Amino acid sequence: MQTHEIRKRFLDHFVKAGHTEVPSASVILDDPNLLFVNAGMVQFVPFFLGQRTPPYQRATSIQKCIRTPDIDEVGITTRHNTFFQMAGNFSFGDYFKKGAIEFAWTLLTNPVDQSGYGFDPEKLWATVYLDDDEAIQLWQEVAGLPLERIQRRGMADNYWSMGIPGPCGPSSEIYVDRGPEYGIEGGPEANEDRYIEIWNLVFMQNERGEGTGKSDFEILGPLPRKNIDTGMGIERVACLLQGVDNVYETDLLRPVIDAVAARAPRGYGRGSHSDDVRYRIIADHSRTAAILIGDGVSPGNDGRGYVLRRLLRRVIRSAKLLGIDDAVVGDLMATVRDAMGPSYPELVTDFDRIQRIAVAEETAFNRTLSSGSRLFEEAAQSTKAAGADRLSGRDAFTLHDTYGFPIELTLEMAAEADLAVDEEGFRSLMAEQRQRAKADAAARKQAHTDLTAYRELVDAHPTQFTGFDELTTEARILGIFVDGRRVPVVGHDTATAQHRIELVLDRSPFYAESGGQIADEGTITGTGASQTAKAAVSDVQKIAKTLWVHRVTVESGEFVEGDTVTAAVDPRWRHGATQGHSGTHMVHAALRQVLGPNAVQAGSLNRPGYLRFDFNWQGALTDDQRTQIEEVTNEAVEADFEVHSFTTELEKAKSMGAMALFGEAYPDEVRVVEIGGPFSLELCGGTHVRSSAQIGPVTILGESSVGSGVRRVEAYVGLDSFRHLAKERALMAGLASSLKVPSEEVPARVAGLVERLKAAEKELDRMRLANARAAAVNAVAGAERVGKVRLVAQRMAGGMSAGDLRTLVGDIRGKLGGDPAVVALIAEGDNDTVPFVVAVNPAAQDLGLRANELVKQFGAAVNGRGGGKADLAQGSGKGAAGIDAALAALRAEIDRS
C-alpha cells in the first residue's frame, strides 16, 4: 500500500466518524520552548488546556513533525529519522478511552477491501500505564485482545507529555509483532526490534509542570475536561504494509537513495556499512531540509536556521564521501518534491524558492570546504611535525566555528591522515562557547521570569489590553513582583536599581513587546490615597500571551496590591513606535512589489524612528532595487493611504490575500491591518498610524546579509529620517567646501583623489621593494657562517608584508648557491605586527634543518606562531621589541645543529 493511500485511509476513517479534518500546522510555531513541532497535538494545546474553545469536538490531522536530538544516529541505525508524519485523532471533551481504542482497532484490523489496513489481530499487542486497569479491561472488551498480549509499563514508556509544561496523561501503545526472524518473543517489554510501536493513544487528562526527563515532573492537576490525543506513525505503518524492513526502503525515501545511487560510484546495499549510512543520511536530511525551507526556515548560525544548515551540510559532506564531486542538492530537492508533493503541495508550488535556498547553501559550504580543507592540512602537518598523533581540540573547534565543519567531518579527515582528534578538548571549547552565548543572551534579556510565579494570575486574571483605543487607562494592581517573587507592597525607599520590579495590571494601554515591535514606555501613577506613587515603565512583556508584566522603576511613594492606578503611555513614544511598525509593513509591501512574492519576511524590529526588516533572499540587492524599494515606499507614504484594522476568521483573512507569516501561530479570529486597500494586507497585532502620511519620509540606510539566504534592510522613518538626511546634507556641503567644487561634483572629485592615492601607494610599495632588494644583494655578500651553514638573518625595513618577505627570500636563496644555507627575514609590519619568513635549501635540509621547525624560534620570541614546509615557512607575531631576540634564537638553534 503506497503512503498516499495510507494517509487517505486514515483521514477518511475519522472523517466518516464525525471528525473534522484539520491541515498540518507549520513545523515552526511561535513558542520559545519548542524548536520544532514534534507531535500531532501541538496545534491543539490551547484546546486541551481550556485556553480556547475548539470549533469542533473531534478532529483528525496528519502533522509534519521534526525531532533532531538524535541527528547523529540517523543513518547509523534505520530507526532514527529527523522528519516524520504523525497521523492523529483528537477528542476535546467528547469520547475518551473506549472510543479511542475502538477507532484505532477498527482501522488497523479491518480488511483492505473494507477501507482498513488489514493487520492480523493475532499479531497486535498493547501496552498500558501501570495502574490503568480501565484500559486493560477495554482492550479485552472492545478489541478482544487477550490479557497475555497486554503489558503494563511505567511513566517513561506509557505516560506522555511534550517534554515541557503542558497537557499530559497516561497512554496505551499498539505494537505489531514482526515475527521470530526479528528477535525473541515476549512482547514489547522484551524486544522492541521485533515488536514495533505503530500507534500511541494518549488519554490526555492532566497538566504537568517543570521537570526533566520522561518522568521527573510534577502533575499540577486535572485538565478542564478529558481529551484524547493519538499518534500513528505514517512511516512505520508504511514499512509494515509495504513489506520492507525500514523507512529507507519505502516509497518515501527509496527514490532519494536511488537518485543518489545513479550518480555515486559505489551503490547502496553493496556491503559497505559506512556508504549505506551516508546514503541514509542524504535521504533523511534532504527530506527534512525541504520541509523546513518550505515552512520558512533559512540556513543560519543558531536555532532553527542552524539545524537546517547542519542538515544540508551533512547531505553535502555525505555525497562527497560517496564520490559525488558535482553539485547534488538541487536534484535532491526535486526528488523530494516528486516523492512528497502529493501529500504536501507546497513543496511543488514553492519549489523554486526551496531549491534556490538549498543550492545557495551548497555553494557556500563548498567554498568553506575548500578553505577549511586548507586549514585542516596545515593543522595536520603542524601536528605531525610536532611528533603528535592527535589534532588539538582548538584546531577542531576553529574548523567548526570558523568554517562550519561538523566534528564528524574533522574526525573522518583526521582518520584519513592517521590522526586522532582531541574530542574532549573540542567539546570543552564548544561548552564554553555555549555558556558565553547563554550569558550574553541573559545579559541582553533579563526579563525572563519563571512562569510558576505568575501561574495564578495567568490562569485567573488575564490582562485586558486597551491600547488600541486609548493611551491612558484606569487599572487595578493584580500583583507586584520583586526579582520574580510576589510581594504585597513595593516602595521607592525599598526598591533599588538592582531590583527587578514588575507590576501586573488588570487593564493596560501599554503595548507588550511582540511581533517585532518593542514595548511602550510611560508611567504608572497612584490615585486617591496612593497618589504620591509614581513609576516609570521601561519595558512590558507578555506571560503566556495573556498577562502584561510591566517592568518599572519606582520614583516616589509606594504601590500596594489591589490599589487603583493610572497607566499612561508616553504619546511621543507610541507615535514613534507606530511610525516604525507601519513603516515596516510599507517596506515589506514594497519589497514584494520589487522582488516578487519569494521575498518572505524572516524577522523584524521596529522602534520609534527606526525599522529593521529581515527577509529570505539570495544575493545582495542592486542599487537600482534599493532605490525602487525606497521610492515605492515613499510614494505610498505620500499617497496618504488610510490605515485601518479589523478582525475576521483566519481562513477568510488568508482568502483575502492577507500575509500570514511563516512560523506564526494564529488563533481562529485574527486581526488584519490594511494599508491603502491592496497595497498592504497583513495579519498583525501591533499598533499603527491612522494614515500612511503620518509615517513621514522613509530613508533606507543600507542592506546587508545576516545569514545565508537572509538579507536585512534598515531604515529611518519620520523625524529621524529627516535628521539623517539633514546630517548627510551637511556632510556633503562640508565636503564640497573642502574640495572647492559644487556638491554634484563631489563624487567624481573623491573618486579621482582615491585613484591618485592608490597610484601613490603602489609607487611607494614598488620603491620599498626595490630598496629591499638592493639590501638583499648586500645581505648575500655579508652572509655569516654558523657552523656548516651560510646564514642570512636580517631585520628588514618597516611596512613590509609577508608576501614581500617571501619575494626577497627567493631572491637571496637563489644567490647563495648549493652550499647549506638558511635565509630568515623579519620585519615590522602594520599595526605592530611582525611578519617573518624562513627558507632552508636542500643542502641545509640534509643537515637536519627544517624551515617549519626554525620558524618556531621566531614565533616564540615575538609572541606569534608559524608553520609551513621543510623548505619554506612563515608566520606572524606581535611586538617589534622581540625581533633581535628572535634572530639570536635562530642563530643559536642553527649552531646547535
UniProtKB/Swiss-Prot annotation:
One of its GO terms (molecular function) is ATP binding. SMART domains: tRNA_SAD (SM00863). Gene3D superfamilies: 2.40.30.130, 3.10.310.40, 3.30.54.20, 6.10.250.550, Bira Bifunctional Protein, Domain 2 (3.30.930.10), Threonyl-trna Synthetase, Chain A, domain 2 (3.30.980.10). Its main location: cytoplasm. One of its GO terms (biological process) is alanyl-tRNA aminoacylation. It holds the Pfam family DHHA1. Keywords: Aminoacyl-tRNA synthetase, ATP-binding, Cytoplasm, Ligase, Metal-binding, Nucleotide-binding, Protein biosynthesis, RNA-binding, tRNA-binding, Zinc. The keyword Signal does not apply. GO terms for cellular component: cytosol. NCBIfam families: alaS (TIGR00344). Belongs to the class-II aminoacyl-tRNA synthetase family. Consists of three domains; the N-terminal catalytic domain, the editing domain and the C-terminal C-Ala domain. The editing domain removes incorrectly charged amino acids, while the C-Ala domain, along with tRNA(Ala), serves as a bridge to cooperatively bring together the editing and aminoacylation centers thus stimulating deacylation of misacylated tRNAs. This is Alanine--tRNA ligase.
